[in-house]
A protein has these predicted regions:
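Classical secretory targeting signals
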Residues: 1-23, 146
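Low-complexity segments
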Residues: 24-146
């Protein structure tokens, strides 16, 4: 009888007790950042470009700009900014959902960075090996990701 009780206890204990599982989520998107993005960030949701009052959404690689009363997502800049140099313009990292909803705040807060003219280190010009995974970097290597 002792053996049966012991066996039932072990079986019941193994059914009731489940192994602990810890989930740690670290979101690093260095490889998906554009080469014209500034160095120093492991994760970026949006860049705000004060010179042209436009956002760039890193996960979908799209520019977000206001046109005719609505926000437009586009893979390229609007025609009026076709000559804008993304390498030289200042980029502000904004890590918040739908950053463009705070456009008025960003426009005021970051207006001092208009015409900043290339005084920000960008990924393409970095010698930090962690940026070599960014497609378009002069020392790019993909570690079998392509």
């Amino acid at each position: 009888m002792k053996k049966i009780c012991l066996l039932l206890t072990i079986v019941a204990g193994s059914i009731i007790c489940t192994p602990a599982s810890a989930q740690v989520r670290v979101n690093i998107n260095i490889g998906s950042q554009p080469v014209w993005g500034p160095v120093g960030y492991d994760h970026v949701d949006y860049y705000y470009l004060p010179d042209i009052e436009t956002y760039y959404y890193v996960p979908t690689r799209q520019f977000v700009y206001f046109n005719n009363g609505r926000w437009i997502y586009s893979s390229s800049l609007p025609y009026r900014y076709r000559n804008y140099d993304l390498n030289r313009g200042y980029k502000v990292v904004v890590n918040q959902p739908r950053a463009y909803q705070n456009y008025s705040l960003h426009r005021t807060e970051y207006s001092r960075y208009r015409n900043y003219g290339g005084r920000q280190m960008i990924i393409r010009n970095s010698n930090d090996p962690r940026y070599y995974v960014v497609k378009g970097h002069p020392k790019y290597y993909n570690r079998g990701r392509d």
